[in-house]
Amino acid sequence: MNDRCSALKDAAARLEAAGCSDARLDAEWMLAEAAGLSRLSLLLDLDAPLSDQEAARFSAYLARRAAGDPLQYVLGHTDFMGHEFRCDARALIPRGDTEPLCEAVIERAGALKTPSVLELGAGSGAVSVSVKLACPGAAVTAA
């Protein structure tokens, strides 16, 4: 792995062989994280060399992803409702298909004078945190 382009090709092939359905995309996200870049910045400069530290981080991420760890756990974070949340195996990964529910709660809470929101079965807390960020005056409890 001398440059980013070669690293991505090798990683995508390894992930495909491991049964990863989004092999190329996952490789891009992991390499961007390893290099401390946005995915867009990475893609705009694929000919750049990898430092030894970047290559080591990328290799560690790749091993975990090839072993079946979810990408969000490998990266240690995920996006939900426009916010970044830390993420690991202690809680379920906040999912994009939960965002419409969260948006409905925010809309409903915004229409109330003194809203109270209770999230039962909170895992990561991403729903409650997102509601509180959107409705700072709401009393939000996660249990």
How should each PLM-predicted stretch be described?
Residues G19, A23, S38-R39, P70, ...:
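Secondary-structure boundary/capping signal
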Residues E16-G19, A35, A66, A109-K113:
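Secondary-structure transition/hinge residues
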Residues M1-L43, A48-L50:
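Non-catalytic accessory regions of SAM-dependent methyltransferases
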Residues G96-A143:
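Conserved SAM/SAH cofactor-binding pocket of Class I
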Residues L8, A27-E28, F58, L71, ...:
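A general structural signal for well-ordered alpha-helical segments in protein cores
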Residues W29-E107:
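Conserved AdoMet
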